[in-house]
Design a protein with these regions (language model features):
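N-terminal basic/disordered segments at the start of proteins
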Residues: 1-24, 29
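Short hydrophobic alpha-helical runs that function as membrane-insertion/retention elements
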Residues: 25, 39-41, 60-66, 70
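A short alpha-helix capping/helix-coil boundary motif
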Residues: 29-32, 165-167
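Extracellular/luminal Protease-associated
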Residues: 27-28, 34-50
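Active-site helix-to-loop segments that bind/position phosphate- or nucleotide-bearing substrates
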Residues: 4-9, 14-15, 57, 65, ...
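Short, well-ordered alpha-helix to beta-strand connector turns
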Residues: 14, 21, 36-37, 58-59
Length: 305
């Protein structure tokens, strides 16, 4: 059971953050770290070794943010996984067919999640994306992912003139980028915890990207952020303010289904562990979670095929 619920947004806090006996002291208040899932640290915060050690002990992720409140780096601890060397070696030796098959499963799950997101938003073309998902081949040589993206983003916010752009500073792209950054930070900590190298990837390749595997494994979770951004816009949000940031971080705490206590956070952890077993040859097929709207939560993930 994943009991952690709280997200601490300290981007506006000015002062020292201390740690003592399992609790954070933030000014005059204290917060049990056992109840914390994620911390956002602002440029006016200061802290010492005690905080870092406490985060490691209670397995809490933290992001360091710039003056805009946008995460620019993360605090994470070294993996204590006893199979770290074996898994790094297995990643380096992973055969091309198995790597391509894993990427196929990831893209199929991402596309199905995007189709589910369009359904949840009452947008057209969900079935078109599902049809594309069924045509994905090993390694996605015909770039079905890109074809699906064009359909998806053209249907995402019709009538607003929206265009998905990773470097744009408009409100919608800013919200999406912020949510993806939070997601990336969580996947990074779970990749390392699973004893995996974040650099040895399946698909993403960039000489300057030390977290290429993280970018691979976060793909199926993107629709959870997309749907939250949609909900914020429907609720009247017109800026990336503190309330919007808190909502985007809260995506990690969404329940997986109506009758289980697993959250996006724990599903990410399970998925990274499954991927580690896959690269070691202990799984024949990589099972990838698929995002789907839940009746009891803003969004949910279900196990893939």
């Amino acid at each position: 059971m994943d009991t952690k619920r709280r997200v601490l947004d300290l981007t506006g806090y000015r002062g020292y953050i201390s740690y003592e006996r399992g609790r954070l002291k933030i000014g005059e208040r204290t917060v049990p770290l056992a109840e914390v899932d994620f911390i956002l640290l602002g440029q006016k915060c200061s802290w010492g070794y005690g905080l870092v050690a406490g985060l490691e002990r209670f397995d809490v992720a933290a992001a360091v943010c710039d003056w805009r409140g946008v995460p620019i780096s993360a605090l994470y601890h070294w993996s204590s996984n006893t199979r770290v060397f074996a898994r790094h070696e297995a990643q380096a030796d992973l055969s091309l067919p198995r790597a391509k098959n894993a990427w196929k499963q990831i893209i199929k799950a991402k596309l199905r999640g995007q189709a589910n997101a369009l359904d949840a938003m009452h947008r057209p073309h969900a079935e078109q994306i599902r049809t594309l998902a069924r045509t994905v081949k090993s390694g996605d040589p015909t770039n079905i992912e890109g074809q699906g993206a064009r359909v998806y983003w053209s249907s995402y916010l019709p009538g607003r003139g929206f265009r998905r752009d990773q470097v744009s500073d408009d409100v919608v792209n800013g919200m999406l980028n912020y949510g993806y950054t939070i997601l990336r930070g969580r996947v990074l900590t779970r990749v390392i915890s699973a004893g995996l190298s974040p650099t040895l990837s399946l698909f993403h390749r960039n000489r300057s990207n030390a977290f290429a595997l993280v970018d691979d494994l976060m793909e199926p979770f993107r629709p959870a952020v997309d749907y939250m951004v949609y909900r914020l816009l429907q609720g009247g949000s017109s800026e990336l303010g503190s309330e919007e940031k808190t909502a985007l971080v809260s995506v990690l705490a969404e329940k997986v289904s109506d009758n289980q206590d697993f959250t996006v956070r724990s599903v990410i952890e399970n998925f990274c562990s499954e991927f580690a077993l896959y690269v070691e040859g202990k799984r024949d097929t990589l099972k990838v979670p698929i995002w789907k709207l839940s009746m009891s939560e803003p969004g949910a993930l279900k196990e893939g095929e």
